[in-house]
Amino acid sequence: MRAPVLKELDLPQYKQSLRKAVKFLNELEYTAVKTKYNAKGNWDAVSIRGYSDDITNILKPGVLKSNVKVEPLRWTRLYEEPDLLPLKEILSHIPAEFERVRVMRLKAGTTIKKHTDKVDKAIKDGKIVRLHIPIKTSMNV
């Protein structure tokens, strides 16, 4: 049986300031996202949950010939970071089991073309969903 595809989640609006979280995130060292859609290096990320304790290890085993070992999924130190408590609170309202959770940055004035992550085949049957939660954005997005 095919699972229904949700287009919108009824989540409470987060009204607290994210300034501390943004400041903390801006001070981290990010890793460039490995994809042909990032040829100019304008897109990077850190891991909050993934296959490693290393926040710069943002890939999934088997993606783009990565050497990421198949390890149990785990939360990185960022999940318990006090300045990122708002992110933890936002995630707590999402009724799902998480695989990877990443904070991604896109340099101002750049865009990413529409694409899919071919390795996540379970997206088609609704077993995996991708959510994008803007922390800092512009009115043009």
Please annotate each region the language model reported.
Residues 1-93:
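Non-heme Fe(II)/2-oxoglutarate
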Residues 87-141:
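Catalytic core of non-heme Fe(II) oxygenases with the double-stranded beta-helix
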